[in-house]
A protein has these predicted regions:
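Short hydrophobic/aromatic patch on the recognition helix
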Residues: 315, 319, 364-365, 369
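Short, Lys/Arg-enriched C-terminal cap helix and immediately downstream tail that follows
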Residues: 324-329, 349-351, 374-384
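DNA major-groove recognition helices of helix-turn-helix
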Residues: 322, 339, 372
Length: 387
């Protein structure tokens, strides 16, 4: 029996993403590819005669020229960005509109009324994410106007971009003057870390006055903050794998898809930077604090009312006016959030997780977790990359 010839594939990612790269490498191992990094090509592409290429078509003119040369030769190419939508090329992209929706809904669930976007530059991907964030925000019933958009490279002269003090003053002037509590959405850990640092410098409390959410797969810069940063996991590894799979099919002769293939975000890791429900009503604010402090106790609305010294009707009315949900729904929401964090970050048994969330036993945890997420706790833990 004749063995299939190994395919020679070029990988040109600028800048390199280890998560996308791992997805590509995993498919390459399964398919038996010879995978070559663009940067390691001796003497450039001139003498290379491969079968296909995976690229990230951003603003690198050399990479754009590479793609043009490959396509003139008839070499299949798959792009892993949403940039340069005018270039007709097969793509496997992150679903930036879904990411924007997820961010807006996350902040709205926490009762934030004001929102803003901060980024260093402005790309087509940023436009998609912010556009979806703004559209979703505007459609939500309890928000106070459209989110503000702040882009450093648009609002500061080019000569000041690398002036750390000037950049700090730019951040500080916006953050000090913004309405509070403010929900801030950033495209990556670098911008969100800078927002957090400027909040500390200005004496602005995170998350009570400014809550911060970013996107990305690299969790080290999110975890290693004075206030750890919440993050939407974009799922770069799956994107890399699916892009490689599409390229393999194109080499086999499959017709390219008419539209870009989009990969939904993997999920959202809630950390301290958004782990807060904004409440201007003093009674609701006190109730929320009590629920958070006593989340491991198996108590409900009756015990909460006794502690606050108010009747259930009054408390329900205040919650409905302030949050649009009942005290019981908020207790359940906080319990599920706590359970999700424990499943993701610890190797505790389901019984231990249930106990720490104020639930009776693992069976009840499984019931409500499946109802709210569509997955049993064990499957959710595996999907989220938990212990």
């Amino acid at each position: 029996m004749q063995t299939q010839q190994r395919r020679d594939i070029l990988l040109a990612m600028v800048p390199y993403s280890p998560w996308r790269g791992e997805g590509v490498r995993r498919f390459a191992r399964e398919a038996g590819w010879n995978l070559l990094e663009w940067s390691s090509l001796p003497g450039g592409i001139g003498g290379w005669r491969g079968d296909g290429a995976l690229v990230t078509l951003r603003n690198d003119p050399e990479l754009a020229a590479l793609v043009r040369r490959l396509r003139r030769r008839g070499v299949p190419v798959v792009d892993m960005t949403a940039e340069h939508p005018d270039v007709r090329i097969p793509r496997v992209c992150l679903d930036s509109r879904a990411i924007g929706r997820m961010a807006a809904e996350h902040f709205a669930e926490r009762n934030f009324r004001h929102a803003a976007w901060f980024s260093t530059d402005w790309t087509h991907t940023h436009a998609l994410r912010f556009g979806s964030f703004a559209e979703t925000w505007a459609a939500l019933p309890r928000t106070a106007g459209p989110p503000e958009r702040h882009v450093l490279m648009e609002e500061m002269p080019r000569s000041r971009w690398n002036d750390s003090r000037a950049v700090g003053r730019w951040f500080a002037s916006i953050l000090r003057g913004a309405p509070k509590p403010l929900a801030v959405f950033c495209p990556g850990p670098a911008e969100s870390s800078r927002v957090a640092a400027e909040c500390r410098a200005c004496g602005i409390a995170v998350p009570e006055e400014v809550a911060i959410l970013c996107t990305g797969d690299d969790q080290m810069p999110c975890e290693n903050q004075a206030v750890p940063l919440s993050c939407i996991l974009v799922g770069g590894e799956r994107q890399g794998y699916e892009a490689a799979a599409l390229l393999d099919r194109l080499i086999d002769g499959e017709a390219p898809p008419k539209e870009a293939v989009t990969m939904p975000p993997k999920g959202l890791i809630v950390r301290a930077s958004t782990d807060f429900v904004a409440a201007s009503d003093p009674l609701v604010a006190r109730a929320l604090a009590l629920v958070a402090e006593n989340i491991s106790r198996p108590w409900g609305v009756a015990q909460l009312c006794r502690t606050l010294g108010v009747g259930p009707r009054r408390l329900c009315r205040h919650f409905a006016d302030e949050l649009g949900r009942s005290p019981g729904e908020e207790i359940q929401r906080q319990r599920l959030a706590r359970a999700a964090a424990l499943l993701r970050d610890t190797d505790l048994t389901l019984d231990a997780v249930a106990e720490r969330c104020g639930l009776c036993h693992a069976q009840y945890l499984s019931k409500i977790f499946r109802r709210e997420t569509g997955l049993p706790p064990g499957a959710w833990r595996k999907k989220s990359g938990g212990a």
